[in-house]
Amino acid sequence: MHMNKLKILMLGPSESGKTTIANYLSESINIEEAGPPRPTQGVRIVEFELPNINVNGKNTNIDIELWDCSGDHRFESCWPALRVGVQGAILVCSPTTTQVATRELELLYNYFVSQPKLSAKQCVLFYNCTNDSDDIESLTLSSTFSKVSQVAINLKSGGNRLKIDFSNYITSVLQAINRYA
């Protein structure tokens, strides 16, 4: 079974750590090498292969096209183009962005998940914890997110856990796509 690339958008407020997560998942950096956040201009596409994903009982390799999208609203005019052919959305926020995050995530979810008619299974929320005392419970989201998986991630202490969470997420995207294919 061979599939085309999976187009996954990574979205969220500026400085929530999207690029670091994208780089880590695609294995282009070690976390120790991650410098201070630099704003992404528009979008950056990271392509990599995710091995051994279980699809309908068979292990397969999936090509991922991870679109690391800027959180800067200057680039909002690009949103319609970003949304074309989207198969999944990863929303990212961090303790430093929780004040703006609630409204921002709602807007992004509406535009990139609800409007293109993705299911909640095709979306995941990564709460990017920068230290161990950060708690996902401090994130108060609307009922819109009641069906969306919300995962606290900590790259410094739990990078491998993030890879597992990401693989699980990709599996749920594939299941959702196959159901509607």
Residue ranges and their predicted role:
Residues 1-181:
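TRAFAC-class small GTPase G-domain
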